[in-house]
From Swiss-Prot:
Keywords: Amino-acid biosynthesis, Cytoplasm, Histidine biosynthesis, Hydrolase, Magnesium, Metal-binding, Zinc. It comes from the Bacteria. This is Phosphoribosyl-AMP cyclohydrolase. It is found in: Cytoplasm. The gene is hisI. It is an enzyme of class 3 (hydrolase).
C-alpha cells in the first residue's frame, strides 16, 4: 500500500480490534514521553475519546466504559492519537492530571526490576488511593 493510499483510509477503519472488540492503548505523557499506563479501548470508548478529547477506556473487570479520572479527578487530556503500523495498537499522548495509576503513582510502571530481581519504586506517589477511592473491606 502506498503512503497516499494508507493516509486516505479513515483512522476508524484502520483500527484492528481483537476477538473481544478491544484494542490496546499505550498512554504517554505528551511533553516528557514517559509511559503512564496501558489500557483497553473498544469502538465506543475510542469515539468518546475523539469527541471529548479526554481519555476513555473499556474496563474489562467492570465491563463498562471508564472515563479516566471520573472518580479520582485524575483526568487525561488527549493531545494526539497515533496508531501503529499493523493497526492493532493505539498510542495516546496526554496531559495527566495527578497520578495515572490507581495505586497512586504518576505511572503504572512505578516498579523497576533490579539485577537481583528485587524491585524498587522508581516513580512519584501522587495520592493515597484509600483517600480517593475509599478503603476496601
Amino acid at each position: 500500500m502506498s503512503e497516499n493510499e494508507d493516509l486516505q483510509k479513515s483512522f476508524l477503519d484502520t483500527v484492528k480490534y481483537d476477538e473481544k472488540g478491544l484494542v490496546p492503548a499505550i498512554v504517554q505523557d505528551h511533553e516528557t514521553g514517559k509511559v503512564l499506563m496501558m489500557a483497553w479501548m473498544n469502538h465506543e470508548s475510542l469515539l468518546m475519546t475523539l469527541e471529548k478529547k479526554k481519555a476513555c477506556y473499556w474496563s474489562r473487570s467492570r465491563q463498562k466504559l471508564w472515563l479516566k479520572g471520573e472518580s479520582s479527578g485524575n483526568m487525561q487530556d488527549v493531545h494526539d492519537i497515533l496508531i501503529d503500523c499493523d493497526g492493532d495498537t493505539i498510542l495516546l499522548k496526554v496531559s495527566q492530571k495527578g497520578g495515572a495509576c490507581h495505586v497512586g503513582y504518576h505511572s503504572c510502571f512505578y516498579r523497576k526490576v533490579k539485577e537481583t530481581l528485587d524491585m524498587e519504586i522508581c516513580d512519584t506517589l501522587m495520592f493515597n488511593p484509600d483517600d480517593v477511592y475509599g478503603k476496601k473491606s
